[in-house]
Design a protein with these regions (language model features):
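Bacterial N-terminal signal peptides
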Residues: 10-20
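Cyclophilin-like peptidyl-prolyl cis-trans isomerases
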Residues: 22-185
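Bacterial N-terminal signal peptides that target proteins for export
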Residues: 1-12
């Protein structure tokens, strides 16, 4: 009888541990950690809104593509933009551009959007922006694919650019690293 009870306890413990790890993994799914000089920004991605855009940023994060990339365009009251390896706003990753995944989900303070050429809705690649305030004029015109869930005060600290130069930043702040939750590299 004692042997059966002990086996039953082991079996229950095994299933409970498995459930705990599954829950922890589910909470990390589609979560990004963006580290800046001021601390960590946590972003929850939204594959329900834009699966291809989420897939792209996760792929690039796994490749450490964003490490050291600057916030090249930051406009006070509008957004902070990064993701161009040249820091000019004219480049992207080695992958093909993405087709737009527009939705009616509003761009609010903390929303994560994919930057693109304003004249080509299907030109998103690796550049993204974080809204510093609500931006209703972007709704249905840009791909909204996530939101800042902690660290928005750190986004507010990112060095701003000149409004007269469309947000171009002199000596811009950098992304120290951008990782998927659970990636400890």
């Amino acid at each position: 009888m004692k042997k059966t009870s002990y086996s039953l306890i082991k079996l229950i413990a095994f299933f409970l541990c498995g459930s705990f790890f599954s829950i922890a993994h589910a909470e990390d799914a589609h979560t990004l950690y963006l580290d800046t000089k001021d601390g960590r920004i946590t972003i929850q991605l939204r594959p329900d809104l834009a699966p291809k855009h989420v897939e792209r940023i996760e792929k690039l994060a796994k490749e450490h593509f964003y490490d050291g990339i600057v916030f090249h365009r930051v406009i006070d009251g509008f957004m902070a933009q990064a993701g161009d390896p040249t820091g000019t706003g004219l480049s992207g990753s080695r992958y093909l551009d993405l087709k737009a995944e527009f939705t009616d989900t509003p761009f609010k303070r903390g929303s994560l959007g994919m930057a693109r050429d304003p004249s080509d809705k299907d030109s998103a690649n690796s550049q993204f922006f974080i809204c510093l305030a609500d931006q209703p004029q972007l709704n249905g015109k840009y791909t909204n694919f996530g939101e800042v869930v902690s660290g928005m005060e750190l986004v507010d600290k990112i060095k701003k650019g000149s409004k007269s130069e469309n947000g171009k930043v002199t000596d811009p702040d950098k992304i120290i690293k951008l990782r998927l939750a659970g990636d400890n590299s």
